[in-house]
Amino acid sequence: WWKPMGRMEKSWLTVAFVWCVFLTVMMPLWYFYGKQNVPTETYRTSPADYGAKVNAFVEQYTVGEDIVNGVTLPVVAAPPGSDVYIRASTWQWYPILQLEKGQEYRLHISSLDLQHGFSLQPVNINLQVIPGYDYVATITPTSAGEFTIVCNEYCFVGHHTMVGKVIVTEEK
């Protein structure tokens, strides 16, 4: 560091500088033109109002029950093109969604109590779920099967048990 830079050191510093400029330009371009971002809308809501919407949704479209982590939850199948609701509350994703492959849905996600992380595995879709906000993502399932929802934001003692499910069936 106390001697003048040699030819190799100047070359590597130039490469590093050009790479930094390239990445600085590419980050915003990739954000807008890449296909990796989940298209979302966000609305203010109250936990009570959102809970009422979820309960009305479950009451209208329940088709059965399933067990997740020893808890019986309703399985809800809304018609394609409709709004579907999922609620995060202390250590539970509610209800279990049943969707059709190849059909578009507007998925509403909110929390009633704490900040949670919505992680749909193995697809690896990740969203932060915060009380007071209704996050709406337009989704189209591309493969059939059972997918697991994991909370990836520590939400206190029962965090490790916060698992939900999305069932995607073949088109009718």
Question: Where are the model-predicted features located?
Answer:
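Extracytoplasmic beta-sandwich strand-turn segments characteristic of Greek-key/jelly-roll folds
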Residues: 2, 6, 120-143
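Short, charged beta-strand/loop "edge" motif centered at a coil->beta-strand transition
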Residues: 91-98
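Interdomain boundary/hinge segments at the C-termini of tandem beta-sandwich modules
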Residues: 166-170
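Short, exposed beta-strand-loop hairpins at the edges of beta-sheets
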Residues: 152-160
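Histidine- and aromatic-enriched segments that form or immediately flank copper-ligand environments
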Residues: 82-86, 108-133, 164
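Short tyrosine-centred short linear motifs in exposed loops/low-complexity segments
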Residues: 102-103, 141-147
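Short, charged beta-turn/beta-strand-edge "cap" motif at the junction between a beta-strand
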Residues: 111-115, 143, 155
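Extracytoplasmic entry segments of secretory-pathway proteins
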Residues: 1-85
